[in-house]
Amino acid sequence: MDELPPEQIQLLKKAFDAFDREKKGCISTEMVGTILEMLGHRLDDDMLQEIIAEVDADGSGELEFEEFVSLASRFLVEEDAEAMQQELREAFRLYDKEGNGYITTNVLREILKELDDKITAEDLDMMIEEIDSDGSGTVDFDEFMEVMTGE
């Protein structure tokens, strides 16, 4: 549960409590599809059953709050990653002025300096060398993503 920010956990608690009509501290796994749809995720029955089986570890047919958070966090974290990739794609496009699918290592150097004004020239050189392993002097979007996300 530690990968979600407290405000998201509070939001999930409100949603959970709304579905926990009998105030038993758990909700029926039958509600999972409805909840995921409210979060903007429509899943087919097979996928839904697979997720429920994974999350309802004790097979009770009910989800305790921790199980519910575990389920919801998969979707929330995924969306955050997608949103971040979209933002990085936009940023890359801004720097790729010619629209040719890459930026120069000099441009990347400027971006990295803007993000971290304490970075040394040596660190920058090492990073650029690692990223531009073929020595082409250019960085494509995938390489840019790798630098920005560390993945």
UniProtKB/Swiss-Prot annotation:
Any matching Pfam family: EF-hand_7
Family matches, as SUPFAM superfamilies: EF-hand
Amino-acid positions noted as binding Ca(2+) 2 in the UniProt annotation, renumbered to this chain: 132, 134, 136, 138, 143
Disulfide linkage: none
InterPro entries in UniProt: CALM/Myosin/TropC-like, EF-hand-dom_pair, EF_Hand_1_Ca_BS, EF_hand_dom
UniProt keyword list: Allergen, Calcium, Metal-binding, Muscle protein, Repeat
Signal peptide span: none
Residues where Ca(2+) 1 binds: 56, 58, 60, 62, 67
Alphabetical list of CDD domains matching this protein: EFh (cd00051)
Lineage: Eukaryota, Metazoa, Ecdysozoa, Arthropoda, Hexapoda
Family membership noted in the UniProt record: Belongs to the troponin C family.
Organism: Blattella germanica (German cockroach)
A GO-annotated cellular component: myosin II complex
Function: Troponin is the central regulatory protein of striated muscle contraction. It consists of three components: Troponin-I (Tn-I) which is the inhibitor of actomyosin ATPase, Troponin-T (Tn-T) which contains the binding site for tropomyosin and Troponin-C (Tn-C). The binding of calcium to Tn-C abolishes the inhibitory action of Tn on actin filaments.
Superkingdom field: Eukaryota
GO molecular function: calcium ion binding
Designated name of the protein: Troponin C, isoallergen Bla g 6.0101
Segments forming domain EF-hand: 7-42, 43-78, 83-118, 119-151
